[in-house]
Design a protein with these regions (language model features):
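ATP-dependent helicase/translocase motor core
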Residues: 1-18, 31-401, 405-427, 436, ...
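Inter-Walker segment of RecA-like/P-loop motor cores
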Residues: 446-487
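Structural recognition of the conserved hydrophobic beta-strand(s) that form the central parallel beta-sheet
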Residues: 220, 475-478, 546-552, 738-739
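Post-DEXD/H (motif II) to motif III coupling segment of the RecA-like Helicase ATP-binding lobe
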Residues: 513-595
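Short basic/glycine-enriched coil/helix segment immediately N-terminal to the Walker B
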Residues: 154, 348, 387-391, 420, ...
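Conserved C-terminal RecA-like helicase domain
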Residues: 473, 628-739
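Conserved RecA-like ASCE ATPase "motif II neighborhood" in helicase/translocase motors
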Residues: 473-507, 511-537, 720-726, 738-741
Length: 741
């Protein structure tokens, strides 16, 4: 099917089909009613007139009874606001109503209100426009004439556009689709740069000239099989306009870097047909409720803050006036949306304790798994009461995924989620370990204009119990205090059984003790066992099911079997995370470096005696050595410490213009402390040599989560807090940071 047929016969009918029939419920709008500055004044007027007839009537008296004149005046006011904002979503989030000529004028209605539900939300006008003509004008000169395949509007306000490509024509979204959008943007920037050579003030027109590219929520391109998304395309403006101005870059040279962030939108299964893929992704990007999420959650300005005051008077003060636009990459939004989608499903079947067991049973039978094998797999899940008394989701996200944003976006949406006419979750609890992540989440809440009265951080059991019964909806708790949560659960048993609480746990399992006979501390299991036990003792009656969402980069097989999803693509009983962003994906996307490319082997000889039960005459004997005996071997630690010190002073510290630094990841707290003491001693001795004296002040720092069995992290760093140690390491020219992984 050629591109025009695809657009007219498939794409537009899907967008404009009623939602109850599987479409998106958009209003098909003729392109000739779109204004030159990307508004549909008649739809803006229609929305306001329907939303508040009395206000509209009152405003008409100021405009000689002319609806057209009033609509244009209102449009110009809205335009001014959006021009001064990062994008339309950020502006609408804080301007659902505006004061215009002394009246409060509604511009957008949210869904799920306590009194009206979705009644007002349905009054919003979502419009799709084919082949809208738009002139890119700078300093009064037309740079380009563009006709995006489909443009989108909300209550008459432009929110983005899409370019279509047809594989039948030998074109794809990946190549020609991305190339069209990027090329159009760069041609416009190049035209501005050329114009500015004679008229420097031309660059002052950037906001209006590039409105179509920079003010929408996102720009997309699809060939039905694949859909690509780019946000914040304006981030490339400075380099592009400078390069074009001094003739040091070309459009061809700039395109590759832009294509790196113009990413494909994920799908739930590779087995989906082309049409199923398209429908799924369009619902994710353009359904009315998803556009609402873009406005309410997924776009916000992040500011810099500093702490002021001490103790109970400690608070954050904003120190930057210009914020940085934060919005999700396709995979991040996909992950958040999947979590919310599964949570809604869980709520719908909350009163069916065997719902997920029966579904798993059907999946297994469909794959031909029967008899003892079927019962064995089901027995494994039954043994853990998985999703019976408490729901759980396991998410495997590697470094570079932006986990703090994922946790923040998820927490805020769970806080606002409604079920059966009330809040779905009475509380949302964020359990974190890293001081940096706690600070990031706190800053994120403030940047998203979340009232401080809506979230709090608790430090002990009494505060935790008080928070459960208080008005604050989001609770941030330190991981060490959370380890004592079982006692608090016992004390607040009746309260929890009548509440629905969502727990978001960062790094659900950790290995900090180093004890050879202990498995890693698993917060997921501890919490679930506590709730399962309490419910079982109470006769198995559940008032509301709690939710546990666990984040980890490296789930063990046991954790996967207990909390993962059955991989139905194979009859082998394997379990996978509910959603994943692996280290390989992070490497491929360029967010982290590939550590396997620069492995430096270190020879470390260790002598172990023959086990007492070793039989010289037996064949195929397996001799195993406890890994803690290897990691904790004193001779091995001495050799490694010596190698590290030599490598730091002779090579690492001299790199990156003399500002090289390093990090050492150790398996447990006691081993980390031992390494720290050894390395500090050796470093002190080496820095007495004239050649390395300049490194004498390079810090050797250590950071770990305090455990009562060992000396505190602060005591290992001269009494400095984790925050100060991290900041000093960041500011230092050279240094080594030892962490517990």
């Amino acid at each position: 099917m050629i591109e025009t047929e695809l657009q007219h016969k498939e794409i537009m009918p899907f967008f404009c089909k009623p939602e109850e029939s599987g479409g998106l419920g958009y209003c098909e709008t003729e392109p000739n009613i779109v204004s030159d500055d990307l508004f549909i004044p008649s739809q803006l007027a229609e929305f306001v007139k329907t939303a508040d007839p009395q206000v509209w009537k009152s405003l008409l008296s100021n405009h000689h009874g002319s609806e057209q004149e009033l609509a244009l005046a209102l449009k110009d006011t809205i335009k001014k606001g959006i021009l001064e904002s990062s994008n339309v979503a950020v502006w609408l989030n804080t301007h659902k109503t505006i004061t215009f000529e002394g009246e409060t004028v509604p511009l957008y209605f949210v869904s799920g209100t306590e009194l009206g539900g979705d009644a007002d939300f349905k009054k919003n006008i979502f419009a799709a426009v084919e082949e809208m003509k738009h002139r890119i004008v700078c300093d009064g000169v037309t740079l380009q004439n563009l006709r995006p395949d489909i443009s989108f509007f909300l209550n008459g306000i432009f929110i983005g556009y899409m370019e279509l490509k047809s594989v039948t024509n030998g074109q794809t979204a990946k190549v020609q689709g991305r190339g069209k959008i990027i090329g159009d943007y760069l041609e416009s920037v190049k035209g501005m740069a050329e114009r500015a050579k004679a008229h420097p003030a031309a660059l002052d027109d950037r906001r209006e000239t590039l409105w179509m590219f920079e003010k929408g929520i996102h720009l997309t391109t699809t060939d039905v099989n694949e859909t690509y998304v780019i946000r914040s395309i304006g981030g490339f403006y400075d380099d592009a306009v400078k390069g074009f101005a001094d003739n040091t870059v070309s459009i061809t040279q700039l395109k590759p870097d832009m294509e790196k962030v113009f990413k494909i939108y994920p799908i739930t299964s590779e087995l989906l047909s082309n049409k199923q893929r398209f429908v799924e992704v369009m619902h994710a990007l353009y359904s009315k409720k998803m556009i609402e999420r873009e406005i309410l959650y997924y776009n916000f300005l992040q500011y810099k803050y500093k702490d002021e005051g001490k103790g109970s008077k400690k608070h954050k003060v904003r120190v930057s006036h210009r914020g940085t636009l934060i919005s999700p990459r396709p995979k991040q939004k996909f992950g958040c949306d999947r979590i919310l989608g599964r949570v809604r499903e869980m709520l719908e079947h909350e009163k069916e304790p065997d719902f997920y067991r029966e579904r798993l049973k059907k999946e297994l039978k469909a794959l031909g798994v029967t008899g003892e094998k079927l019962e064995g797999i089901l027995a494994d899940r039954d043994r853990y009461c998985n999703n019976k008394y408490v729901y759980s989701l396991l998410l495997q996200y590697a470094a570079g995924f932006g986990k703090s944003n994922i946790i923040g976006w998820t927490a805020l949406q769970l806080k606002d989620l409604r079920h059966e006419g009330e809040w779905a979750f009475d509380k949302v609890m964020i359990v974190v370990d890293r001081l940096q992540l706690r600070d990031q989440i706190d800053t994120m809440m403030m940047s998203m204009n979340i009232d401080k009265s809506m979230f709090t951080e608790v430090t002990n059991q009494d505060e935790f119990i008080a928070a459960l019964t208080g008005l604050k909806r989001i609770i941030v708790v330190n991981i060490q205090k959370f380890l004592e949560l079982q006692n608090a659960l016992d004390k607040s048993d009746k309260t929890l059984k009548r509440m629905r609480v969502a727990f978001l746990i960062d790094e659900i399992h950790r290995s900090n003790t180093g004890d050879s006979n202990k498995e890693m501390i698993n917060l997921f299991e501890k919490l679930q066992d506590g709730i399962n036990g309490a419910v079982a003792q109470g006769g198995g009656k559940v008032y509301k099911k709690n939710l546990i969402v666990g984040f980890t980069a490296t789930p063990t097989e046991k954790v996967l079997a207990r909390f993962g999803e059955f991989k139905s693509a194979s009859i082998i009983p394997t379990w996978v995370p509910f959603d994943a962003y692996t280290m390989q994906e992070a490497i491929d996307d360029g967010y982290i470096l590939n550590p396997t490319k620069h492995i430096i082997p270190v020879v470390s000889k260790i002598n172990f005696g023959v086990p007492a039960d070793y039989d010289p005459g037996a064949e195929d004997q397996t001799i195993t050595i406890d890994k803690t005996k290897i990691y904790g071997n004193s001779d091995r630690m001495e050799q490694i410490s010596h190698f590290i010190v030599n490598r730091l002073v002779s090579l690492v510290y001299g790199k990156i213009h003399g500002t090289g630094k390093a990090m050492l990841a150790v398996t447990s707290i006691p081993f980390a402390i031992d390494y720290c003491n050894r390395i500090r001693k050796m470093m002190g001795e080496r820095c007495k040599e004239p050649l390395y004296a300049r490194y004498a002040n390079a810090p050797v720092s250590i950071v770990y989560s305090d455990n009562q069995e060992y000396e505190s992290s602060a005591s290992m760093n001269g009494g400095d807090s984790e925050a100060k140690v991290s900041q000093d390491f960041k500011n230092a020219k050279n240094g080594l940071m030892i962490v517990v992984d």
